[in-house]
């Protein structure tokens, strides 16, 4: 499958709606060493003169190790027919399952990163910064309900 390269500003759909409602698979690593997980939190914007994507990966997640090890990652967005696969990838650990195989997803190399051939939108990202979440800095009490067990 071939993908058409577009500027992130030319994505027709709202990123907020895409990540909140459709979710995405975050894939970190290289073709022979990667993991994926479902993400439904994230944002796009402008920072330091660059178009950026921010994603949030808990340290307990297997994918976190890949995010630390590699400088690139992708976000793969899918049509609704893949919602069950995204649910699986969010509930199961790559330590225990080959998620791509379990969900019949085909990994493809994309500029040194990995994405899934079945995606209808892929955002290729380069890690430029990272920060740990500090719950003591939460200002709105409702956030705690989404920060399960402090992770």
Identify what each model region corresponds to:
Residues 1-151:
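Basic, polyanion-binding surface patches
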């Amino acid at each position: 499958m071939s993908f058409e390269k577009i500027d992130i500003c030319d994505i027709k759909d709202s990123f907020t709606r895409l990540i909140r409602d459709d979710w995405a698979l975050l894939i970190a690593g290289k073709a022979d060493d990667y993991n994926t997980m479902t993400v439904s939190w994230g944002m796009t914007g402008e920072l330091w003169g660059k178009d950026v994507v921010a994603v949030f990966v808990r340290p307990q997640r297997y994918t976190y190790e890949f995010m630390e090890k590699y400088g690139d990652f992708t976000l793969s967005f899918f049509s609704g027919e893949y919602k069950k696969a995204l649910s699986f990838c969010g509930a199961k650990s790559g330590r225990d399952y080959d998620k791509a195989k379990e969900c019949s997803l085909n990994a493809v190399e994309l500029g040194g990163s990995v994405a899934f051939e079945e995606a209808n939108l892929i955002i290729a990202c380069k890690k430029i910064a990272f920060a740990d979440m500090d719950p003591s800095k939460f200002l709105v009490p409702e956030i705690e309900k989404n920060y399960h067990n402090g992770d």
